[in-house]
From Swiss-Prot:
Entry's Gene Ontology molecular function annotations: anthranilate phosphoribosyltransferase activity; magnesium ion binding
Cofactor binding annotation: Binds 2 magnesium ions per monomer.
HAMAP family linked to this entry: TrpD
Family: Belongs to the anthranilate phosphoribosyltransferase family.
Protein name per Swiss-Prot or TrEMBL: Anthranilate phosphoribosyltransferase
A cellular component annotation (GO) from this entry: cytosol
Binding site for 5-phospho-alpha-D-ribose 1-diphosphate: 84, 87-88, 92, 94-97, 112-120, 124
Listed pathway(s): Amino-acid biosynthesis; L-tryptophan biosynthesis; L-tryptophan from chorismate: step 2/5
Assembly and oligomerization: Homodimer.
Binding site for Mg(2+) 1: S96, E230
Organism: Burkholderia vietnamiensis (strain G4 / LMG 22486)
Binding site for anthranilate 1: G84, N115
Function in brief: Catalyzes the transfer of the phosphoribosyl group of 5-phosphorylribose-1-pyrophosphate (PRPP) to anthranilate to yield N-(5'-phosphoribosyl)-anthranilate (PRA).
Binding site residues for anthranilate 2: R170
Amino acid sequence: MTITPQEALQRTIEHREIFHDEMLHLMRLIMRGDMSPVMAAAIITGLRVKKETIGEIAAAATVMREFAHHVEVPDNSNFVDIVGTGGDGAHTFNISTASMFVTAAAGAKVAKHGNRGVSSKSGSADVLEALGVNIDLQPDQVAASIAETGMGFMFAPNHHPAMKNIAAVRRELGVRTIFNILGPLTNPAGAPNQLMGVFHADLVGIQVRVMQRLGAQHVLVVYGKDGMDEVSLGAATLVGELRDGQVHEYEIHPEDFGLQMVSNRTLKVENADESRVMLLGALDNQPGVAREIVTLNAGTALYAANVAASIADGIQLAREAIASGKARAKVDELVRFTQQFKR
């Protein structure tokens, strides 16, 4: 059964759910550019006001995946995405990007899906460019990068070209909509495991259940109670874990892993170059908060990737990857590999 955009808008005004097949239809209209900007703006605003349901988000993510340019990775064992929704307003250096190098050095395969900074001073694409990585790769080149280096960066605009049909609407609205939470749900390489940071506590339970509906294997959705979309050193972290089809929600604390609780204030950066310096300092094993938070997040990602049996074991593997110099070497490896495709 199809639904007209006008009927969908009325549904949101009445705070009623848009059903799965209806949401698929509406989202396809948006992604094809077949819905007027006025109606698209009204519907995504209406969804935000009534609060998007797990079913609506899962359907929207399904369509975004349909329209994506996919990266084919034949072996998805120990294959993980480390990603945040962004929008936490913390302006920290790129913790998840730093964690990618450590996680790959410790034996996982990482498909990092990211973009330039919008709410942050430095998005993952910005800091990778500052490091010398060529982010403008075709899907087959990203697949080769994962096979060769254990890491691949998927620059979102290259993989989600249909998003251009809603870009102007989103820009003009200037408020968060369903599209702000779809990015981490739509990894073009289809990584079955994920460490996903979110910008609000309510999203922990929502996003992990969306991933459950989308057929993911092992996912940890995290929210630092100090407002970070990462596993935090400055507060407890809420975790929603999907494993073996079951969801469990719990809290973790830095002290659980022998880490000191410290403020994340020292992790703030003003631009991509400052982020690059802090990232390299952490990977060069310089003692401090940056190294510790990367170790904590990479350890959690190694658990999500099923390389480690627990977060604690993952942290130990992450420490070894940094101390041995293997994590730092991964930066140079990715730079070298991606530069051969420079156009």
